[in-house]
UniProtKB/Swiss-Prot annotation:
Pathway(s) the chain acts in: Glycan metabolism; L-arabinan degradation
EC primary class: hydrolase
Stated name of the protein: Probable alpha-L-arabinofuranosidase C
Reaction catalyzed: Hydrolysis of terminal non-reducing alpha-L-arabinofuranoside residues in alpha-L-arabinosides
Location within or outside the cell: Secreted
SMART domains: Alpha-L-AF_C
Length: 505
């Protein structure tokens, strides 16, 4: 949580850090990823058999190494819009017997050479947990139950035995399952009304939890501010009666929301992620309202928010039908850093956040047949995932604000837009970590900082211009390391992310 006092441009900025005020534990899953059968994310991205850079499984070793550096705790799969016509059974068993299918989300052909077992093996190699999305378009409840049985079944049953036949004796124990993806969208195969979706989601959730009560089920929301979100929460945050007792059990564990932002102008681009902060606040209130109206006991699990698609994406610059291969700038990297600051500030309400996507498709990593490129957006992800963990702590910021146009326009009307965007954490290791984005394109900002003492480690992400880019063989944006003596004021460079880190005395 960051409180804010607005100053004039002539007043001296200040930042006060309060490590003793631990506000909420940060769920490591806010640094989750996403891989979809879209463009070159899977084929030619994480899976590239025959390439000299791939291992015996066909997994790109350079991609694995770069993703391991991000400490990704969970990866969502296999979609996305792709999921609405995907049938998991096509992607298991001998590869020569797997059918190729027309793919309707991105108008391609799905060969099914990479499926459930390959993805789960890849997760084990990466050291991450899987998060599966169920087919709410052309899929059936029987198909969904069979997939859970295939992944998690321990008994002598058909799909558990099919998994064993395919070479995996022990269950995978997949915990996270989404009840569809963007089923409200007109681009979806089998678009649904909120009434139809809520009824279907509740009934599926009952059956899934009967099969495996340990599942963590994620409801399909919109952007957190829509009537869809309120209606589905109200209808689905109803406890179900257990068939074996008189008690009731909650069915929904998280509510999913999505947001992509972009603007060709720097300042609207870097302030746009503040829309995510307002969306989290509104969704949190809708969860509470649904629980109150439904009479949910206060000691029963309160669902958290699963922000399972977020990123900077300009669909004109990077068309989805052409693989959505973005070439990210420093401005985009700073927007990603503001997103991450939002997630740290709102950690109390967040159970997960998945950047879309992990490789090649609107991604911090781009592959070629000869290697990988770490885009500008890789570096804020690296710093936050490495250091911004533990507890969110209280910060008070005093500085001037950006007063221009935002995208969306309503952001400036409901959120403060200070020149410095700040979050702070206290790690399990006793270190205080403060992330500060100076969104100003032209002005370094000198600020006093109340909290640190002695020598402070400084990590900086910046470049000569906001349009600096790491593609085409250039590396114009990376992390630099330095130190700062805390008795002095600190100068935050123009258009930069700075992470300050010191041991709490």
């Amino acid at each position: 949580m960051t409180t804010f006092t607005k100053l004039s441009d002539q007043d001296a900025p200040s930042i006060s850090i309060h490590p003793a005020r631990r506000l909420s534990k940060i769920n490591p899953n806010i640094y989750a990823g996403f891989t979809e059968h879209m463009g070159r994310c899977i084929y030619g991205g994480i899976y590239d058999p025959g390439n000299s850079l791939s291992d015996e499984n066909g997994f790109r070793k350079d991609v694995l190494e770069a993703l391991k550096e991000l400490n990704i705790p969970v990866v969502r799969y296999p979609g996305g819009n792709f999921m609405a016509t995907y049938h998991w059974i096509d992607g298991v068993g001998p590869k020569e017997k797997r059918p190729a299918r027309p793919e309707l989300a991105w108008l391609g052909t799905e060969t099914n050479q990479f499926g459930t077992d390959e993805f789960l093996k890849w997760c084990e190699v990466l050291g991450t947990e899987p998060y599966f999305c169920l087919n709410f378009g052309t899929g059936t409840l029987d198909e969904a139950l069979a997939w859970v049985e295939y992944c998690n079944g321990t008994k002598d049953t058909y799909y558990a035995n099919l998994r064993r036949k395919n070479g995996r004796e022990e269950p995978y124990n997949v915990k996270y399952w989404a009840l569809g993806n963007e089923t409200w969208g007109p681009w979806q195969v089998e678009q649904m009304t909120k009434e139809a979706y809520a009824h279907k989601a509740y009934q599926w959730a009952k059956a899934l939890k009967l099969l495996d009560p340990s599942l963590i089920l994620i409801l399909c929301g919109q952007d957190g501010t829509a009537s869809w979100d309120y209606y589905t929460l109200k209808q689905c945050l109803l406890p179900a009666h257990s068939p074996l007792s008189t008690s009731t059990v909650p069915l929904i564990d998280m509510h999913s929301i999505h947001l992509y932002t972009s603007s060709p102008s720097h300042l609207p681009n870097v302030t746009a992620p503040l829309a995510a902060e307002r969306a989290i606040e509104i969704t949190s209130s809708l969860i509470d309202l649904a629980r109150i109206e439904n009479g949910v006991p206060p000691d029963q699990h309160r669902p958290t928010i699963c922000f399972d698609e977020w990123n900077v994406w300009d669909p004109i610059r990077a068309e989805g039908s052409k693989g959505a291969e973005e070439s990210y700038t420093l401005s985009d990297a700073l927007a990603v850093a503001v997103f991450l600051n939002v997630f740290v500030r709102k950690s109390k309400d967040l159970g997960m956040a998945c950047i879309a996507q992990s490789v090649n498709v609107i991604s911090p990593l781009m592959t070629s047949k000869d290697g990988i490129t770490k885009q500008t957006t890789y570096w804020p992800l690296y710093l936050f995932s490495k250091y911004m963990r533990g507890w969110t702590i209280s910060v008070h910021l005093s500085c001037a604000s950006y007063e221009g146009e935002t995208s969306p326009k309503w952001v400036r009307g409901v959120k403060d837009t200070p020149w410095l965007d700040v979050s702070a954490t206290l790690g399990e290791d006793g270190y205080v970590n403060v992330a500060v984005v100076n969104i100003h394109e032209e002005k370094d900002i000198r600020s006093s900082i109340d909290g640190p003492s002695g020598t402070v480690s400084v990590f900086t992400v910046t470049g000569e211009r906001v349009q600096a880019c790491n593609m085409n063989g250039k590396e114009e944006v990376a992390v630099t390391e330095s130190t700062w003596e805390a008795r002095e004021q600190f100068v935050f460079p123009k258009h930069s992310l700075t992470l300050l880190r010191w041991k709490l005395a």
